[in-house]
């Protein structure tokens, strides 16, 4: 049965059919059509992300998508999900998540969407709703609340100015803020770090690029490093082996092996930095479609013409090395190597994101390599 609101012609339906999923995916492009900074995600990629057979997130999570309709017209959407791998912050608290929020600027639409998602979570024993997560903390996270004047980088979201206030009207408050930093070729590592870099790597430290000939093994090494490095961060949820394989498959056509740098200490994998070409720069005019000619355009722009911007979505050093003198320098050595390579390949700007506001070590690194905070994404929470 549809979820009926007090507005007689406004209802919420659970997404059950391929046709309804198609409507769910298509809605944000229509809602944001007049926003010059909106970039429509690829429909094929979004379909895979929201289909249990192609997204291993569903192996450990329960998900329900909802569409809000008015008079036969789609006016909003939201997801509700429970990730069984999510650690609970305190005893007696059970978090459920919401995500994929997009709606017309109408309080009634936001109200019926959140009521549907909250009722679904409450019926499954959840005590709090946290989000947005699209769909997990290891994917797109947070609602854009500051920095609306530029397009989003690859795998980052973009939301209208009214979205944050509308969510807060539903009783949600800030749980965490996530920062995005911009940097260009004029930025560099701090002078004191530069002096150490110029002296060369100390004994036992090795920097190397991604080896595509053993790509799957390299992605497993990357996941091992990041699962360890991030394990004490707020909201940390480990990436599973199946998710690692899916990550490897999805990034293989996009990643540039020259822009992925591993570090080793005494023969052990210790850290990693990934510069990811900004695919959004290449798909901005494709309107989410790869057929009939979108694939050719995308590959030509990425592999031949090249894009000028990149994002650093992944950076970390294993905890056992973080307090040692060599370990503390690893981010700067890796950043220097990958940044210099990116600039030599024609990139002129990049984003470091997302960085937890509370992660002072990482905000310090971002600022000390020339990064300027220019976007804020907010994760909200509400007691149910």
From Swiss-Prot:
GO biological process: sphingolipid metabolic process
Catalytic activity, reaction form: 3-oxosphinganine + a fatty acyl-CoA = N-acyl-3-oxosphinganine + CoA + H(+); 3-oxosphinganine + tetradecanoyl-CoA = N-tetradecanoyl-3-oxosphinganine + CoA + H(+); 3-oxosphinganine + hexadecanoyl-CoA = N-hexadecanoyl-3-oxosphinganine + CoA + H(+); 3-oxosphinganine + (9Z)-hexadecenoyl-CoA = N-(9Z-hexadecenoyl)-3-oxosphinganine + CoA + H(+)
Pathway per the UniProt entry: Lipid metabolism; sphingolipid metabolism
Entry-linked SUPFAM superfamilies: Acyl-CoA N-acyltransferases (Nat)
Gene disruption: observed consequences: Deletion mutant cannot form bacterial ceramide. Mutants are impaired in growth at elevated temperatures but are resistant towards the antibiotic polymyxin B.
Keywords, sorted A to Z: Acyltransferase, Cytoplasm, Lipid metabolism, Transferase
Places the protein is found: Cytoplasm
InterPro entries: Acyl_CoA_acyltransferase (IPR016181), BcerS-like (IPR039968)
Protein EC: 2.3.1.-
Single Gene Ontology MF annotation: acyltransferase activity
EC primary class: transferase
GO cellular component: cytoplasm; membrane
UniProt keyword Hydrolase present: no
Transmembrane segments: none
Protein function: Involved in de novo bacterial ceramide synthesis. Catalyzes the condensation of 3-oxosphinganine with an acyl-CoA to generate oxidized ceramides. Can use acyl-CoA substrates ranging from C8 to C24, with highest in vitro activity with C14 and very little activity with acyl-CoA thioesters of 18 carbons or longer. May have a preference for monounsaturated acyl-CoA substrates, as it has a threefold greater preference for C16:1-CoA over C16:0-CoA as a substrate in vitro.
Additional detail: The bacterial ceramide synthesis pathway operates in a different order from that in eukaryotes. Furthermore, phylogenetic analyses support the hypothesis that the bacterial and eukaryotic ceramide pathways evolved independently.
Annotated protein name in UniProt: Bacterial ceramide synthase
């Amino acid at each position: 049965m549809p979820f009926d609101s007090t507005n007689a012609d406004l209802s919420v339906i659970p997404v059950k059919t391929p046709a309804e999923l198609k409507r769910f995916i298509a809605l944000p492009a229509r809602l944001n059509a007049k926003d010059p900074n909106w970039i429509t995600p690829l429909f094929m990629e979004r379909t895979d992300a929201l289909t249990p057979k192609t997204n291993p997130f569903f192996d450990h999570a329960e998900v329900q998508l909802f569409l809000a309709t008015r008079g036969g017209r789609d006016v909003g959407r939201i997801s509700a999900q429970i990730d069984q791998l999510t650690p609970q912050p305190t005893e007696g608290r059970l978090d459920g998540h919401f995500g994929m929020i997009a709606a017309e600027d109408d309080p009634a639409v936001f109200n019926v969407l959140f009521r549907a998602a909250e009722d679904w979570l409450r019926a499954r024993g959840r005590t709090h709703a946290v989000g947005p997560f699209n769909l997990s903390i290891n994917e797109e996270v947070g609602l854009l609340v500051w920095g609306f004047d530029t397009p989003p980088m690859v795998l980052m979201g973009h939301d209208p100015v009214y979205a944050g206030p509308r969510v807060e009207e539903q009783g949600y408050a800030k749980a965490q803020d996530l920062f995005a930093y911009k940097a260009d070729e004029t930025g560099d590592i701090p002078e004191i770090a530069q002096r150490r870099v110029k002296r060369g790597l100390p004994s036992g430290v090795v920097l190397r690029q991604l080896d595509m000939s053993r790509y799957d093994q390299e992605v497993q090494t990357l996941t091992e490093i990041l699962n360890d490095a991030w394990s004490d961060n707020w909201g940390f949820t480990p990436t599973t082996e199946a998710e690692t394989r899916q990550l490897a498959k999805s990034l293989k056509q996009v990643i540039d092996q020259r822009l992925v740098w591993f570090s080793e200490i005494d023969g052990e994998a210790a850290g990693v930095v990934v510069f990811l070409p900004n695919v959004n720069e290449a798909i901005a005019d494709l309107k989410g479609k790869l057929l009939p000619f979108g694939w050719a355009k995308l590959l030509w722009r990425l592999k031949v013409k090249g894009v000028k911007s990149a994002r650093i979505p992944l950076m970390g050093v294993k905890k056992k090395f973080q307090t040692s003198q060599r370990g503390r320098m690893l981010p700067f050595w890796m950043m220097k190597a990958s940044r210099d390579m990116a600039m030599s390949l024609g990139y002129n700007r990049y984003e470091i994101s997302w960085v937890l506001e509370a992660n002072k070590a990482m905000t310090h690194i971002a600022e000390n390599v020339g990064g300027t905070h220019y976007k804020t994404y907010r994760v909200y929470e509400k007691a149910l």
